[in-house]
A protein has these predicted regions:
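Generic structural signal for buried aliphatic residues
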Residues: 11-12, 96, 187
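A general structural signal for well-ordered alpha-helical segments in protein cores
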Residues: 19, 48, 59, 77-80, ...
């Protein structure tokens, strides 16, 4: 019997459901659960009009907010928030680069600014997306198709590039990141485009570099983000609202890089 929620209640679903038994789950670190059951991947509920949520701890109140605007935070929002927390604070004269200006990168720029990262360089190969990145709060931008992308990134960061958040995760972004970082810099990888890049192992001790992965985020972090949205701290990234029946065209547009921000599907009128 369900008595903790009411019909018509507007909630955002946290989809990264942990096993509930391991130490990570008991500490609300669902993203570290080795047996995570993801709604939409490992259990039904993605690209659907309904889904089953087993516990109200995975529901976040969004009453009064536009659901389409905030729903990306249950994926891209917590992903970059979690990674930026792991990154740690930077000094006022230090810089962070955000590699990739897709939906994940756009949210990263906005959330990084809300978390106190003041010097942000957005990196992408699409000038249109770089323009959008400036509107989202990036301080500077770099088109990494430039043959001198490493040195250009170092110049833009005034020799103080202490953090890179890679939201793409390809061979090219990894290669640029580890070469451009200043000594004691931190490379956080969240993107999963795939690929390999090489770097001399000796760079890790000689540059005192941190290379770390981060996977999605946790339910308390989602609540923090939604509270930041309510407080007006997070700038709204572009949202492309489409009917669920147009999903195939949306996938095609994503594959061809024709989307700025995030696509959010909404049920068709007859659903």
């Amino acid at each position: 019997e369900v008595n903790s929620v009411k019909p018509g209640q507007q909630d955002l679903v946290f989809p990264w459901i942990g096993c509930g038994e391991c130490d990570a789950c008991k500490e609300d670190r669902e993203s570290d659960c080795a047996a995570m059951r993801i709604i939409g991947l490992k259990q039904k509920g993605g690209f659907a009009t309904h889904c089953l949520v087993e516990n109200d701890k995975f529901l976040v109140d969004i009453d009064g907010l536009d659901a389409a605007d905030v729903v990306p935070h249950a994926c891209s929002g917590i992903t970059v928030f979690n990674a930026l927390e792991k990154m740690g604070a930077l000094r006022s004269d230090e810089w962070i680069a955000i590699m990739g200006c897709g939906g994940l990168g756009m949210n990263a720029i906005s959330i990084a600014g809300a978390m106190g990262f003041n010097n942000i360089i957005a990196v992408d190969i699409d000038n249109g997306k770089l323009e959008a990145a400036l509107e989202m709060g990036a301080t500077k931008v770099l088109n990494s198709q430039n043959d001198d992308a490493v040195s250009e990134l170092q110049k833009l960061a005034e020799g103080r590039l202490m953090g890179v958040l890679d939201t793409f995760g390809g061979a090219a972004t990894g290669r640029i990141a580890v070469r451009a970082l200043s000594k004691a810099g931190r490379y956080l990888l969240v993107g999963q485009a795939g690929g390999d890049f090489q770097m001399p192992q000796v760079w890790l001790p000689q540059k005192a570099m941190t290379v770390r992965g981060s996977h999605v985020g946790n339910s308390p972090q989602l609540r923090k983000i939604i509270e930041m949205v309510r407080q007006g701290k997070i700038k709204q990234m572009p949202i492309d609202r489409r009917p669920l029946s147009k999903i195939n065209q949306a996938v095609h547009d994503l594959e061809n890089g024709n989307v700025t921000g995030r696509i959010v599907f909404q049920p068709d009128e007859n659903d």
